[in-house]
């Protein structure tokens, strides 16, 4: 059994069952004929972004939102350290090596507020379509690079 098939089965089980913890998930995997080590299951849960949430006093394992844009937005948001502006442009500081991805994400949004982006290693220069829109553009960037 490969990793993809195993993780697909985990997603299927979580969509069809109310699972409170990894032990219960491991048992459901075994019941379906999949033999998985606890350490492997733990890694799979981390890679899939599975969280435990308390609902009505009970815990339930949940998959993250399946909307790819929302997932990417959250990932890109984690890479951003700060967003600062002056009268003419906006500078986004990122984790080292992440500026290109953040710049590409902003370019993909095709906002009329953004004339263009230039990315280095850890800095993105965002050039507004008009200097009159700096405040609106900064808010737009915060909204589109947030984790929520």
From Swiss-Prot:
A single BP term in Gene Ontology: protein complex oligomerization
The protein's annotated pathway? Amino-acid biosynthesis; L-arginine biosynthesis [regulation]
Q: Which Pfam families match?
A: Arg_repressor (PF01316), Arg_repressor_C (PF02863)
> Is Repressor one of the keywords UniProt gives this record?
yes
Which terms in the GO cellular component ontology are assigned? cytoplasm
Domain of life from the UniProt record: Bacteria
Q: Which GO terms describe its molecular function?
A: arginine binding; DNA binding; DNA-binding transcription factor activity
Q: Which residues form the signal peptide?
A: none
Among InterPro entries, the record links this protein to: Arg_repress, Arg_repress_C, Arg_repress_C_sf, Arg_repress_DNA-bd, WH-like_DNA-bd_sf, WH_DNA-bd_sf
Compartments reported by the entry: Cytoplasm
Keyword set, alphabetical order: Amino-acid biosynthesis, Arginine biosynthesis, Cytoplasm, DNA-binding, Repressor, Transcription, Transcription regulation
Q: Does the keyword Secreted apply?
A: no
Under the heading HAMAP family, the entry gives:
Arg_repressor
Tell me its family: Belongs to the ArgR family.
Function text: Regulates arginine biosynthesis genes.
Q: What is this protein called?
A: Arginine repressor
Tell me the organism.
Pelodictyon phaeoclathratiforme (strain DSM 5477 / BU-1)
Q: What is the lineage of its organism?
A: Bacteria, Pseudomonadati, Chlorobiota, Chlorobiia, Chlorobiales
């Amino acid at each position: 059994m490969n990793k993809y098939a195993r993780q697909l089965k985990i997603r299927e089980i979580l969509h069809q069952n109310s699972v409170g913890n990894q032990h219960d998930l491991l048992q459901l995997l075994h019941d379906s004929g999949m033999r998985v080590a606890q350490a492997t299951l733990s890694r799979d849960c981390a890679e899939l972004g599975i969280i435990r949430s308390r609902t009505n006093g009970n815990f339930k394992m949940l998959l993250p939102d399946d909307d790819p844009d929302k997932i990417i937005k959250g990932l890109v948001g984690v890479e951003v350290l700060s967003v600062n502006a002056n009268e003419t442009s906006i500078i986004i500081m990122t984790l080292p090596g992440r500026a290109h991805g953040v710049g590409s994400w902003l370019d993909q949004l095709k906002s009329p507020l953004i004339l263009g982006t230039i990315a280095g290693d850890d800095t993105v220069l965002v050039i507004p379509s008009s200097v009159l829109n700096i405040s609106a553009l900064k808010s737009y960037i915060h909204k589109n690079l947030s984790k929520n």
